[in-house]
Design a protein with these regions (language model features):
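Cytosolic, long alpha-helical scaffolding segments
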Residues: 1-209
Length: 209
């Protein structure tokens, strides 16, 4: 089943990897859109709709993976892990979209720099996840990408804690404080979800070793 701690697969099941590559690509695309909005929040409604459109594409890719799973007798790795990986990747995109939506819902037109910093970390995590997913098919070194996602999540924790502490120290408007605190928390959850996806990838590799 494996060689060198990586997954071997039946060529007829390559469609799974194509769908996972598509889904992970949407993660990176959505995260980059979010980062751009937070760095320069013009035309909020239109640009947040673009993130939502990517999130819908991710939902369709996730559904396609689950449909393929239900139709397949032979799979490249455990059925449960295929479901977990699809769901965990989709979760990252869901929370990326949720963060973008907070900007419109709460009319946050001047997000703090820490928000774009967190979004930048999400972009890096999504890029690492995409590389890790691609290497499942190519028998490559998945683990280093999982480890980097986890390191980035630790960094995001520090950024989020500092940002929230700064809010409580400096923000005098309690309503604005609540809105920005929630934005930071949703962004931080997105980084947590990326770590969850990396942990699923790692488990797949370890089971195949």
């Amino acid at each position: 089943m494996s060689r060198g701690g990586v997954v071997r697969f039946i060529p007829t099941e390559a469609k799974f990897f194509e769908l996972f590559a598509e889904l992970s690509g949407y993660l990176t695309e959505g995260a980059k859109l979010l980062r751009g909005i937070l760095e320069d929040p013009y035309d909020l409604d239109m640009r947040v709709e673009q993130v939502q459109a990517i999130e819908h594409k991710g939902d369709r890719a996730t559904h396609a993976i689950i449909t393929k799973l239900n139709q397949s007798f032979i799979t490249p790795f455990d059925r449960e892990d295929i479901h977990k990986l699809a769901s965990s990747l989709d979760d990252v995109l869901d929370f990326t979209n949720a963060a973008a939506n907070r900007l419109v819902m709460y009319k946050i037109t001047q997000p703090p720099p820490a928000a774009s910093e967190l979004a930048g970390l999400i972009v890096l995590q999504c890029e690492e996840l995409a590389q890790g997913v691609s290497l499942l098919e190519k028998n490559g070194a998945v683990m280093k990408h999982c480890e980097e996602v986890n390191r980035l999540e630790d960094e995001a924790d520090h950024v989020s804690r500092r940002a929230i502490a700064s809010l409580f120290d400096g923000e005098k408007d309690p309503i604005k404080l609540i809105k920005l605190k929630e934005l930071f928390e949703v962004l931080e959850v997105a980084t947590d979800k990326a770590e969850d996806a990396a942990n699923v990838l790692e488990a797949i590799v370890l089971k195949s070793a």
